[in-house]
């Protein structure tokens, strides 16, 4: 990994390569002739004025596409899109996280992005942290080019293997804690630790594990207290909910991950985010259900210490690494964990993905009538026939249609649609955004989605139909689909009827909520 400077250093960690058209003062080294020999008619054109300074990164604007070819989308988050990108000069592949400036609606949002870049540069060179190759800013977005972790998410690798042991879980956890111990020793709290944020560098069996997504991370000093509630619901520590926390909150999140690794479900569970938070504050950790009777005393002891409700009494990263269960050649047994654990782990991963897939189906499977109506609406709003709609055209168009939206809702609709942050929305973006503003659980939308999966119109979704539909989206293998059927299939007939489908779709999904700052009343 390349050298980096901590925030505040005057040197750039990743200076942009000089473009082929970069200007050099006449008379500088390598000039073809001295100023005295150049006639006025042959004098070079004056140097271009420097690029304006970007308001987010505070450095000259630069077009990331002049250096990288941006390819297919890899993922989408609250603030932007991650795409595959290729360095034009070397052909090397990276991941490019594009953060739309239109989505950065508050001063805190801008500061979060700026700090994310600073923290990633600060942690550069650490083997367990995804490397930031460069940060670029143009008029519409900030682009973070990072090393590509092509091996996928940690839990997906475990599921694909089909079996694992306490010893393997111990080894994984040791790697995760080593990474976070390094972050803490360098004055960084991650604040959003969860399985999805640990990726494998490649598909190789022994590929290194990398921590990613430092968008909520902060620098900290010893004794400093943080008060904003951030993170992903299942993994948030109780002191975060009480608005008084430090680096110990990361240990809690890893403790939740360990609990899931050992039994397949989160320790704090409810049908809503509010319910999960209350469960976290109660702090009761269940070791009575199976498979805990077959899990070693050492593993349970470490989970208890990591999930201690009092952060002052919680085990530190250093002490976790010295715990007998986690030490290399320690006491973690090599006997396979119960197959039921893997089944539950699959369900925990697959259910979230199935619901996301179904929501995408709802957004993408509009009836011809709806599409025709929305197409006409788009045309009528596009007053200058440019093929795109500005926020002003959107506002006026909605008012003409008698749609009563507040200014904030109009802005929300615009921001939801404008994925590339260029200030306008095209037809496809408009369709997606219009659906986004509707309630996704409306009866007709749910029925449309159900029909999409029910290929033979039998009134049931079978394993084969679900597999076919989800394979089209490249989401799951057959085993995961079987697990989903059994989870949703309330009457145990081996298939999903409409009532069961609706119940699944309307069930609380806390992870669908934004992970950003929350106002929580408990």
UniProtKB/Swiss-Prot annotation:
Residues annotated as binding ATP = 74-82, 97
Reaction(s) catalysed (UniProt annotation): L-seryl-[protein] + ATP = O-phospho-L-seryl-[protein] + ADP + H(+); L-threonyl-[protein] + ATP = O-phospho-L-threonyl-[protein] + ADP + H(+)
Region (Disordered) residue spans: 1-58
Q: Give the encoding gene's name.
A: CPK14
The protein's role, per its UniProt record: May play a role in signal transduction pathways that involve calcium as a second messenger.
Q: Name the Gene3D superfamilies for this protein.
A: EF-hand, Phosphorylase Kinase, domain 1, Transferase(Phosphotransferase) domain 1
Instruction: Give me the residues that bind Ca(2+) 3, please.
Output: 454, 456, 458, 460, 465
Q: How does this protein sit in the membrane?
A: Lipid-anchor
Any idea what this protein is called?
Calcium-dependent protein kinase 14
Q: What PROSITE patterns does this protein map onto?
A: EF_HAND_1 (PS00018), EF_HAND_2 (PS50222), PROTEIN_KINASE_ATP (PS00107), PROTEIN_KINASE_DOM (PS50011), PROTEIN_KINASE_ST (PS00108)
């Amino acid at each position: 990994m390349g050298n980096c400077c901590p925030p505040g250093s005057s040197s750039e960690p990743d200076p942009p390569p000089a473009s082929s058209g970069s200007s050099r003062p006449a008379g500088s080294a390598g000039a073809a002739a001295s100023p005295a020999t150049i006639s006025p008619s042959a004098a070079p054109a004056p140097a271009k004025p420097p690029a304006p300074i970007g308001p987010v990164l505070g450095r000259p604007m630069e077009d990331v596409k002049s250096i990288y070819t941006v390819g297919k989308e890899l993922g989408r988050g609250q603030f932007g899109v991650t795409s595959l990108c290729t360095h034009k000069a070397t052909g090397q592949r990276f991941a490019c996280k594009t953060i739309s400036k239109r989505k950065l609606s508050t001063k805190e949002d801008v500061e979060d992005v700026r700090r994310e870049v600073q923290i990633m540069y600060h942690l550069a060179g650490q083997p367990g942290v995804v490397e930031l190759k460069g940060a670029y800013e143009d008029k519409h977005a900030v682009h973070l080019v990072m090393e590509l972790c092509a091996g996928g998410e940690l839990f997906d690798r475990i599921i694909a293997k089909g079996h694992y042991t306490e010893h393997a879980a111990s080894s994984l956890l040791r790697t995760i804690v080593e990474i976070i111990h390094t972050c803490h020793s360098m004055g960084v709290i991650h604040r959003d630790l969860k399985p999805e944020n640990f990726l494998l560098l490649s598909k190789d069996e022994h590929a290194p594990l990398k921590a990613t997504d430092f968008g909520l991370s902060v620098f900290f000093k010893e004794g400093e207290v943080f008060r904003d509630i951030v993170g992903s619901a299942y993994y948030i520590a109780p002191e975060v909910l009480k608005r008084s926390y430090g680096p110990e909150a990361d240990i809690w999140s890893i403790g939740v991950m360990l609990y899931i690794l050992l039994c397949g479900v989160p320790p704090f569970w409810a049908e809503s985010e509010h319910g999960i938070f209350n469960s976290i504050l109660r702090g009761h950790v269940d070791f009575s259900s199976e498979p805990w009777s077959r899990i070693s005393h050492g593993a349970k002891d470490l989970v208890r210490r990591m999930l201690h409700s009092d952060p002052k009494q919680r085990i530190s990263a250093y002490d976790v690494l010295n715990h007998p269960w986690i030490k290399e050649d320690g006491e973690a047994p090599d006997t396979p964990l119960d197959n039921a654990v893997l089944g539950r782990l699959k369900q925990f991963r697959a259910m979230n993905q199935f619901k996301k897939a179904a929501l995408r189906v709802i957004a993408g499977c509009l009836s011809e009538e709806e599409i025709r109506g929305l197409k006409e609406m788009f045309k009528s709003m596009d007053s200058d026939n440019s093929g795109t709609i500005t926020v002003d055209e959107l506002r006026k168009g909605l008012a003409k249609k008698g749609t009563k939206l507040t200014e904030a809702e109009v802005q929300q609709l615009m921001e939801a649609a404008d994925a590339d942050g260029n200030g306008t929305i095209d037809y496809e973006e408009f369709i997606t955004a219009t659906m986004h503003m509707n309630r996704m659980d409306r009866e007709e939308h749910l029925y449309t989605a159900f029909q999409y999966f029910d290929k033979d119109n039998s009134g049931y979704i079978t394993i084969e139909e679900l597999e076919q539909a989800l394979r089209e989206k490249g989401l799951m293998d057959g085993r995961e689909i079987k697990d989903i059927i059994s989870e949703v299939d309330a009457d145990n007939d081996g298939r999903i009827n409409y009532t069961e489908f609706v119940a699944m779709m309307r069930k609380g999904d806390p992870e669908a909520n934004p992970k950003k700052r929350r106002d929580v009343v408990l």
